[in-house]
């Protein structure tokens, strides 16, 4: 019998693997007491599925105007990459809690204008389980958007409502879910296409708009990942 690598070293071997994206892997390694040769940082292309990233710029400095201009491209991206013959889930990240609610309403407004008010709903509205879950939703606006296939999350909704949204989204009944950037580490859902609507948030402490931390962007992009279901993934960065 040959010796294993762990039996030939003088100190115990410890492996710490992180599935979240980091911008300071070397600092984390030093904090854990590892020297640089024992810290491994994998490139973004080392992921279970190939990812196509699409970037669209907006030359508008006024935040509200820029977000308003992004509504139609977000809707179009859902239709284009979310699929028509084979609808696939779309996860949309927005800068704020208020924006998550308003964007959900905007998506339904555009669907209604296209004459397909429930194009994002992929379950029989009369299905007993679906009706029961909708009746349990406490937020009235959320209940109305879910009935048409669009859910949204933010820190203000109840834990029960959040679980219902995640359940309907993961089952495929609801195709679209809008989430504020601040919750990107809290959710447990993934999608075929991730759309990042703007890359700045308002810092209330200093009353300025700041760019998203690169770690947050990488984490949001990483949620376009369903290796057991899809063969590839898409991300749209606005």
Question: Language-model segments: what does each one mean?
Answer:
Residues 12-14, 189-238:
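Conserved segment of the helicase C-terminal RecA-like domain
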Residues 94, 98-176, 204, 209-215:
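Conserved C-terminal RecA-like helicase domain
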Residues 12-111, 151, 155:
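Conserved interdomain linker/interface between the two RecA-like ATPase lobes of SF2 helicase motors
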Residues 25-36, 182, 187-192, 225:
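Short regulatory helix/loop adjacent to the ATP-binding pocket of P-loop NTPases
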Residues 1-13:
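Short, conserved "post-DEAD/DEAH" coupling segment immediately C-terminal to helicase motif II
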Residues 10-16, 88-91, 149, 173-176, ...:
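Loop/turn-to-beta-strand initiation segments
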């Amino acid at each position: 019998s040959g010796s294993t690598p762990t039996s030939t070293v003088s100190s115990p071997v410890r492996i710490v693997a992180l599935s979240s994206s980091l911008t300071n892997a070397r600092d984390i390694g030093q904090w854990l007491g590892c020297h640089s040769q024992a810290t491994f940082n994998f490139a973004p292309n080392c992921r279970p599925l190939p990812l196509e990233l699409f970037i669209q710029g907006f030359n508008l400095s006024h935040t509200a105007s820029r977000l308003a201009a992004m509504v139609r491209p977000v809707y179009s991206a859902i239709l284009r990459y979310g699929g028509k013959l084979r609808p696939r889930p779309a996860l949309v990240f927005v800068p704020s809690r208020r924006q998550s609610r308003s964007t959900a309403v905007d998506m339904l407004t555009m669907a209604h204008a296209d004459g397909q008010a429930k194009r994002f709903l992929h379950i029989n509205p009369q299905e007993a389980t679906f009706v029961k879950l909708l009746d349990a939703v406490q937020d009235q606006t959320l209940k109305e958007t879910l009935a048409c296939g669009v859910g949204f999350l933010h820190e203000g909704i109840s834990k029960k409502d959040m679980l219902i949204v995640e359940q309907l989204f993961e089952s495929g009944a609801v195709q679209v879910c809008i989430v504020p950037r601040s919750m990107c580490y809290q959710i447990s859902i993934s999608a075929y296409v991730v759309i990042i609507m703007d890359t700045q948030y308002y810092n209330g402490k200093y009353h300025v708009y700041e760019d998203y931390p690169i770690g947050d962007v990488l984490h949001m992009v990483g949620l376009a990942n369903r290796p057991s279901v899809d063969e590839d993934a898409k991300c749209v960065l606005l």
